[in-house]
Amino acid sequence: MAMAMSDSGASRLRRQLESGGFEARLYVKQLSQQSDGDRDLQEHRQRIQALAEETAQNLKRNVYQNYRQFIETAREISYLESEMYQLSHLLTEQKSSLESIPLTLLPAAAAAGAAAASGGEEGVGGAGGRDHLRGQAGFFSTPGGASRDGSGPGEEGKQRTLTTLLEKVEGCRHLLETPGQYLVYNGDLVEYDADHMAQLQRVHGFLMNDCLLVATWLPQRRGMYRYNALYSLDGLAVVNVKDNPPMKDMFKLLMFPESRIFQAENAKIKREWLEVLEDTKRALSEKRRREQEEAAAPRGPPQVTSKATNPFEDDEEEEPAVPEVEEEKVDLSMEWIQELPEDLDVCIAQRDFEGAVDLLDKLNHYLEDKPSPPPVKELRAKVEERVRQLTEVLVFELSPDRSLRGGPKATRRAVSQLIRLGQCTKACELFLRNRAAAVHTAIRQLRIEGATLLYIHKLCHVFFTSLLETAREFEIDFAGTDSGCYSAFVVWARSAMGMFVDAFSKQVFDSKESLSTAAECVKVAKEHCQQLGDIGLDLTFIIHALLVKDIQGALHSYKEIIIEATKHRNSEEMWRRMNLMTPEALGKLKEEMKSCGVSNFEQYTGDDCWVNLSYTVVAFTKQTMGFLEEALKLYFPELHMVLLESLVEIILVAVQHVDYSLRCEQDPEKKAFIRQNASFLYETVLPVVEKRFEEGVGKPAKQLQDLRNASRLIRVNPESTTSVV
């Protein structure tokens, strides 16, 4: 009943405080008038405080829930933006492929259109500014839009314009000697770093009918440039970069295996660059296709004429010609062969890579034992162009710019088709580069929060899981291929392990974590690394080699800390027995010494809570054994001498201090107590250290044996006032 009244009072109080016309001063005045005394005010105060705490908890809970929803929404928006960006690229590729199909199906119509464009262009007059430049050399539907024999005024004008512009570029005189080359478009650009989006330099781009010249701006001379790079349009891909203020009006040029990002003056200039690059690439591809068709065309009339006008030709020479004519008869009239180039275009446009490669395999199998007369060569030339286009699309599928969320299995489709096309080495290189980018992205996205050991658990799980999945997928994709691919994978795995160790060392060793934390982190990394042995991949020696320098530094640093602490305790040594005051404290010390391996510690305990040892010797024992235990977790053969020398240095500090105290002490009782501590060090602590070291390493340490078996204590200078020589 009282609980119900309390709840109703709290709800009434909440409604009163939440009302729109609530005034605090008037409320306090009424409350003071209505209360019977101090007790009522105290109870009311408690109710208000409880209500305040409840409100604060609700507010905190709502903020946390809204924050989580905000983070999840932002992450989904980021994923959606990435997918939309990739979808835009796919639509652009399909548009380009669909536009190229009519040119293939209707070469006569395309040629007529090109001739019409040529006639129209010769009659076009110049204009001012940038339009004047484009009127001379600008957007052509094909490179043959003007006269190609040099007799037309348009061709001469383009050549003069190209010569004039290239004379302003240092280091590209050889380009002026290329016949048939003319300028299509040019303009100023700003280059940005592809990784950090930092401005690099001002450049000027010269787009010719078969290549792209990039020249850097010389600030010392107005209007002069220096040659930077020349890219063939065959291996050049143009990608639109989505505006992300202040980074806008940008586009990317992909030249395997590198990429460059440029910024245009404005959106209009950027659109012109994208359009003219695509148009020029398409025109160059069409031109080369026609040249291949002309080169593959049969030259029958000259051969017939030569035979008809040669009355002295012997019959013996005609005999081998009969089977030669018969060999040239290859049936290419089948419907699937006639439609093969168009079917390949459709498969590439629809991203049916398997279907395209199946058609190529079918054709190769059909022509495997057939001769190569001109019709077959012509067909092969058409098919080779489609193979090149298919290879470019598959290479783009494996580029790191693509989505990495699908894991290594997402690359299997493109890799398998590249292998079927005979591009095994390229497939291996692109697959490993894609996975390296995925591993780098996964490590970079890890949040550094909370304890170091928790972060290392996440880091090891992410990295070694990715490495294991990559190894299994590699074994599936490249089974039965050249063994050189497996060598490339081992090299890649070592490089990836270096990336992991960089992130590991930065968090564990550079942040000066304790030796125990570092030992636990290294232990976790070793355990994950040993899991790779399930697939026959042992990288333990690599992680040892990469971590040895950092672990040596950690051992040396912690050794110096122990030595300094021991020296400080030695300077304050009074050689008195320890009094732990309570049985609980004595029991705790016994457990600690037992965990250190000192099993006979009971004989050094006296009546009540006394211990017949010095505080300095007991503290030294616990610290030394703790150092040894943590160091053994970090141990591998390359660290053997480092660990052994560190132990000897630490032990010598305590031994020298005891020896010096024995020589300097005059009181017989204290001298006997010092001898008891020395006996504990030599007969108990050193054997325990030696035994534990041998158990952890697997072999005894001669230096520790010599130190324990010394016939007398180490000599020191009797006149010295320090504990170390």
Curated annotation (Swiss-Prot):
Keyword DNA damage applies: no
Domain of life: Eukaryota
Region span, Disordered: 137-159, 285-328
Residues covered by the PH domain: 182-282
Gene Ontology CC: one annotated term: perinuclear region of cytoplasm
Entry keyword set: Cell projection, Cytoplasm, Disease variant, Epilepsy, Exocytosis, Phosphoprotein, Protein transport, Transport
Phosphothreonine carried by residues: 142
Variant or mutagenesis effect after changing residue 265 to G: Found in a patient with Joubert syndrome; uncertain significance
A molecular function (GO) term: phosphatidylinositol binding
Extent of Acidic residues compositional bias: 312-328
Modified residues (Phosphoserine): 19
Cellular localisation: Cytoplasm; Cytoplasm, Perinuclear region; Cell projection, Growth cone; Cell projection
One Gene Ontology term from the biological process aspect of the record: mitotic cytokinesis
Residue ranges the record marks as coiled coil: none
Function of the protein: Component of the exocyst complex involved in the docking of exocytic vesicles with fusion sites on the plasma membrane.
Subunit structure: The exocyst complex is composed of EXOC1, EXOC2, EXOC3, EXOC4, EXOC5, EXOC6, EXOC7 and EXOC8. Interacts (via PH domain) with GTP-bound RALA and RALB. Interacts with SH3BP1; required for the localization of both SH3BP1 and the exocyst to the leading edge of migrating cells.
Associated pathology: Neurodevelopmental disorder with microcephaly, seizures, and brain atrophy: An autosomal recessive neurodevelopmental disorder characterized by severe global developmental delay, developmental regression with loss of milestones, severe microcephaly, and brain abnormalities, primarily cerebral atrophy and hypoplasia of the corpus callosum. Affected individuals develop seizures in the first year of life. Death in childhood may occur.
Similarity annotation: Belongs to the EXO84 family.
PANTHER family associated with the record: EXOCYST COMPLEX COMPONENT 8
Protein name: Exocyst complex component 8
Organism: Homo sapiens (Human)
